[in-house]
Amino acid sequence: MTSSLKIWGILLALLCILCRLCVYSNNIYWREFIKLHYLSPSREFKEYKCDVLMREKEALKGKSFHMFIYSLWFKIQRACINEKGSDRYRNAYVWAPGALKVLECHWEKYNNRYTESRSFSYIEFHCGVDGYVDNIEDLRIIEPISN
C-alpha cells in the first residue's frame, strides 16, 4: 500500500512539473522571434545599422540575409488575433493589418559588410500552434525608404 502511494506521489509530482513547463514555455517561439526580428521604436529607424545588429545578435552571426521589423511589439503580436479579438489564429499564415517598417540586411562578401534596404511593407506572418507570431513568411514592399 505504501509503495503504491509513493508511486502515485511521484507521478503527481512529475505531472506538476510537466504542467509548469507547459505554462512557462508557452510563448518561447514568440520571445525568440522578438529577440531576432524586433527593432524598438525607442530609437529612430535610421539609427539601426545592419553591420551592428548582425554582430550584436549571437544567433545571426554568419547569416547572409536577415529581416528586422520596426514597430511597436503589440502590433506584431496582434497579427495572430482574429478580427473579433476573441481568439488567436493557430498554425496559420496571416498578413499584418497595416504596413510596417522593415530593415533588410544582405551580406556582400566582396565588400565584407552588410547592405541595407529599408521599406514600408506588408508582412505575412506565421502564427504558431501557441497562437503567437513565430516566423516571417512573405513580404510585399509598398514603398522604399531612403536613408
UniProtKB/Swiss-Prot annotation:
Lipid metabolism in keyword set: no
Provide a GO biological process annotation: sperm displacement
Q: What is one term from the GO cellular component aspect held by the record?
A: extracellular space
Q: In which tissues is it expressed?
A: Epididymis, with predominant expression in the corpus region. Moderately expressed in the vas deferens; only low levels are detectable in the caput and cauda regions.
Q: What is its main location?
A: secreted
Swiss-Prot/TrEMBL keywords: Secreted, Signal
Where can this protein be found? Secreted
InterPro entries (alphabetical): EDDM3A/EDDM3B, RNaseA-like_dom_sf, RNaseA_domain
Q: Where is the signal peptide?
A: 1-25
Against PANTHER family, the record matches this protein to: EPIDIDYMAL SECRETORY PROTEIN E3 ALPHA, EPIDIDYMAL SECRETORY PROTEIN E3-ALPHA
Q: What does this protein do?
A: Possible function in sperm maturation.
Protein's UniProt name: Epididymal secretory protein E3-alpha
Q: Which organism is it from?
A: Homo sapiens (Human)
Gene from which the chain derives: EDDM3A
